[in-house]
């Protein structure tokens, strides 16, 4: 039986602003990796990734994380998937996340273009795309734009229908921006200080620990590796989905959380229009983070779909 680390869950409540602390400096966010102007020819960025080896005769599995996430969210799952399927597995940091470059362009078109640059470079075309939430939208768009790149598609608890951003998402960013940490303190102490400040508004320890995975030390000062300014500015864009006319005719699985409300029955018609071969499957007792709430059920569903 595989052992899985429990991941975080986003609370439904709205976060407030946190209070500044004396004798400390604001935690900045790394901006030295900026790529230039928004929509500058949609040139792909050199994404950070981790590739696990496997059978090169089979299409690789590519995991795309959600908002505020990183490739490390799938570490355990990726290793288990290699063992179970024998395939190569790629995990990727989206632009403005993890160790990938920052850019003022947070559009799905840009994120799709990044993958169109990376996947052929690694010899992973065609591949199986598995995207959660924001990563699911990127995966859908790439499949619609470049069906030759995507052998089959798994979309986790998101749909091609735009939604209004929850106020808690903007509050996550505001809470992180408000954190202040003294210079040149040990990383363990910095995490404790940040956790304490976030705790006044982020009540669930799981979500705090998830956000704190983005806290890094640069030159003796602590920074958020997320591009918080761009993400805050483009939340509306991130919550929408680009209008598309031509469908993706490849095999597609929409894997939904039984306790999640992200994908409504009213979305199914648009799912069927754009993905006519779509299977829609629900994992009971799972929330939005299906792969962390019910990892074994998630693995079973994906591997069955690949069979």
UniProtKB/Swiss-Prot annotation:
GO molecular-function term, one example from the UniProt record: lipase activity
Modified residues annotated as N6-succinyllysine in this record: 79, 196
GO cellular component: mitochondrial matrix; mitochondrion; oxoglutarate dehydrogenase complex
Gene3D superfamilies on file: alpha/beta hydrolase
Catalytic activity: 1-octadecanoyl-2-(5Z,8Z,11Z,14Z-eicosatetraenoyl)-sn-glycerol + H2O = 2-(5Z,8Z,11Z,14Z-eicosatetraenoyl)-glycerol + octadecanoate + H(+); a 1,2-diacyl-sn-glycerol + H2O = a 2-acylglycerol + a fatty acid + H(+); a 1,3-diacyl-sn-glycerol + H2O = a 1-acyl-sn-glycerol + a fatty acid + H(+); 1-octadecanoyl-2-(9Z-octadecenoyl)-sn-glycerol + H2O = 2-(9Z-octadecenoyl)-glycerol + octadecanoate + H(+)
Keyword set includes Hydrolase: yes
EC number(s) on file: 3.1.1.116
Tissue specificity remark: Expressed in white adipose tissues.
Keyword DNA-binding: no
Catalytic-site annotation from UniProt: 133 (charge relay system), 229 (charge relay system), 288 (charge relay system)
Transit peptide boundaries: 1-34
SUPFAM superfamilies attached to this UniProt entry: alpha/beta-Hydrolases
Pfam families: Abhydrolase_1 (PF00561)
Disruption phenotype: Homozygous knockout mice lacking Abhd11 are viable and only a slight but significant reduction in body weight has been noticed in males exclusively. In addition, less abdominal fat deposit is observed. Mice show some eye defects, including iris synechiae, melanophagy in the iris or the ciliary body, cataract (with reduced lens size when advanced) and retinal atrophy. Such ophthalmologic defects lead to blindness in 9-week old male KO mice.
PTM section of the record: Phosphorylated.
Compartments (UniProt record): Mitochondrion; Mitochondrion matrix
Induction record: Up-regulated by rosiglitazone and down-regulated by high fat feeding.
Main location: mitochondrion
Domain of life, source organism: Eukaryota
Keyword terms: Hydrolase, Mitochondrion, Transit peptide
Protein's job: Catalyzes the hydrolysis of diacylglycerol in vitro and may function as a key regulator in lipid metabolism, namely by regulating the intracellular levels of diacylglycerol. 1,2-diacyl-sn-glycerols are the preferred substrate over 1,3-diacyl-sn-glycerols. The enzyme hydrolyzes stearate in preference to palmitate from the sn-1 position of 1,2-diacyl-sn-glycerols. Maintains the functional lipoylation of the 2-oxoglutarate dehydrogenase complex (OGDHc) through its interaction with the OGDHc by preventing the formation of lipoyl adducts.
Subunit structure: Interacts with OGDH and DLST; this interaction maintains the functional lipoylation of the 2-oxoglutarate dehydrogenase complex.
Family: Belongs to the AB hydrolase superfamily.
Alphabetized PANTHER family for the sequence: PROTEIN ABHD11
Descriptive protein name: sn-1-specific diacylglycerol lipase ABHD11
Taxonomic lineage of the native organism: Eukaryota, Metazoa, Chordata, Craniata, Vertebrata
Gene behind the chain: Abhd11
């Amino acid at each position: 039986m595989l052992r899985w680390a429990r991941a975080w869950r986003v609370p439904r409540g709205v976060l407030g602003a946190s209070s500044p602390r004396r004798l400390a400096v604001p935690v900045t966010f790394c901006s030295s990796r900026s790529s230039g102007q928004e929509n500058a020819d949609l040139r792909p960025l050199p994404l950070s990734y981790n590739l696990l080896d496997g059978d090169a005769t089979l299409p690789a599995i590519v995991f795309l994380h959600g908002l505020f996430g990183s490739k490390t969210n799938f570490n355990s799952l990726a290793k288990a998937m290699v063992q179970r399927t024998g395939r190569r597995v790629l995990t990727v940091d989206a632009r403005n996340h993890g160790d990938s470059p920052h850019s003022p362009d947070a559009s799905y078109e840009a994120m799709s273009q990044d993958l169109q640059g990376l996947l052929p470079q690694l010899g992973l075309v065609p591949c199986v795309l598995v995207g959660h939430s924001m990563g699911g939208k990127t995966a859908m768009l790439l499949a619609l734009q470049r069906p030759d790149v995507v052998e089959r598609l798994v979309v986790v608890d998101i749909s091609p229908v735009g939604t209004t951003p929850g106020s808690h998402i903007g509050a996550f960013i505001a809470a992180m921006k408000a954190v202040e940490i003294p210079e040149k303190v040990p990383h363990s102490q910095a995490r404790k200080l940040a956790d304490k400040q976030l705790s006044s508004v982020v009540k669930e320890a799981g979500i705090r620990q998830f956000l704190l995975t983005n806290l890094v030390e640069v030159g003796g000062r602590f920074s958020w590796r997320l591009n918080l300014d761009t993400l805050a500015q483009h939340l509306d864009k991130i919550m929408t989905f680009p209008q598309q006319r031509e469908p993706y005719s490849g095999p597609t699985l929409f894997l939904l959380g039984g306790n999640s409300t992200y994908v409504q029955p009213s979305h199914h018609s648009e799912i069927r229009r754009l993905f006519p071969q779509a299977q829609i499957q629900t994992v009971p007792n799972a929330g939005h983070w299906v792969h962390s709430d019910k990892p074994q059920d998630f693995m079973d569903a994906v591997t069955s779909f690949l069979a």
